C-alpha cells in the first residue's frame, strides 16, 4: 500500500485461530484504495489486505460480522489451497447462508416461512420519491443479503435486481450516512443509463467512474445528483 495512504484500521475485533479480524473504514478504502471493496475481504481476494487478516467494513446498522467471518474462514482457506475465487466464494456463500438461516433472518421476510420473501419487508424508510416516479428506499441490507441476494452491496435498483420492485432504488443501511450520497449517485446514474438502453456493464463502469470522481471532489456531488433527477 503506498506510503501516502493511511491505514484503514478502526478497531481490532476478535481473533479466530491464526486470523485477526479488523473493523476498517470501508469508505476510505473505496475512496482511496479500491472503489470495488465491499463489506469484507481477505488477502487472496484483495492483495492489499495482509495475509491472516480479515477486514470487515464498519457497519451503520445491523451487525453481520458473524456471517462475514464464517464466510471469510472458508474463502481464505480454500484460496490458500489453490482454489479459484469463483469456487471458493460458492462454498463460502453456502456456509454464510446456513448461518443467516440459523439466525432466523429469512423468517422475518417470509411471514415465518409461510410466504415467498416480501420485498417491502426490507424497507426501512422512504428517502425520497423523485419527479419521474422513482422511489429511493433505505433498506435493511442484512435482510436483503439473507433473503434475496447474499452478494447485495451498497445499493441496487430494478434494472439490475429482479427482486427490487419496479421503479425502486435501494440503498443499503449498512452504508454510513456520509457515504450514502455517493452510492445514491452511482445507482441513479446507472439506472438512468440502463433505462435508456445502455447495457449493465457499460452503465456500471460509467457510474463507478462518476462515483469515484465525486468521492474525490465532493463539491461536485450536489450538481451530479441533480443531473440524475435528485432535485
Regions found by a protein language model. Give the residues of each.
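Active-site recognition of the HExxH zinc-binding catalytic motif
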Residues: 67-79, 182-191
Amino acid at each position: 500500500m503506498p506510503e501516502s495512504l493511511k491505514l484503514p484500521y478502526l478497531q481490532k475485533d476478535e481473533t479466530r485461530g491464526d486470523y485477526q479480524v479488523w473493523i476498517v473504514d470501508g469508505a476510505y478504502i473505496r475512496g482511496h484504495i479500491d472503489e470495488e471493496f465491499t463489506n469484507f475481504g481477505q488477502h487472496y481476494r484483495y492483495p492489499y489486505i495482509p495475509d491472516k487478516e480479515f477486514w470487515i467494513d464498519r457497519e451503520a446498522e445491523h451487525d453481520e460480522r458473524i456471517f462475514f467471518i464464517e464466510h471469510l474462514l472458508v474463502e481464505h482457506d480454500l484460496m490458500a489451497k489453490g482454489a479459484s475465487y469463483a469456487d471458493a466464494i460458492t462454498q463460502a456463500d453456502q456456509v454464510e447462508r446456513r448461518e443467516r438461516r440459523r439466525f432466523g433472518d429469512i423468517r422475518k421476510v417470509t411471514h415465518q416461512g409461510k410466504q415467498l420473501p416480501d420485498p417491502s419487508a426490507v424497507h426501512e424508510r422512504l428517502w425520497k420519491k423523485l419527479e419521474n416516479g422513482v422511489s429511493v428506499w433505505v433498506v435493511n441490507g442484512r435482510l436483503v443479503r439473507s433473503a434475496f441476494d447474499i452478494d447485495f452491496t451498497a445499493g441496487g435498483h430494478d434494472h439490475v435486481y429482479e427482486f427490487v420492485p419496479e421503479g425502486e432504488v435501494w440503498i443499503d443501511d449498512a452504508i454510513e450516512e456520509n457515504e450514502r450520497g455517493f452510492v445514491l449517485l452511482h445507482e441513479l446514474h446507472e439506472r438512468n443509463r440502463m433505462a435508456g438502453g445502455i447495457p449493465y456493464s457499460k452503465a456500471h463502469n460509467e457510474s463507478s467512474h462518476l462515483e469515484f470522481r465525486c468521492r474525490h471532489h465532493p463539491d461536485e456531488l450536489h450538481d451530479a445528483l441533480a443531473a440524475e433527477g435528485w432535485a
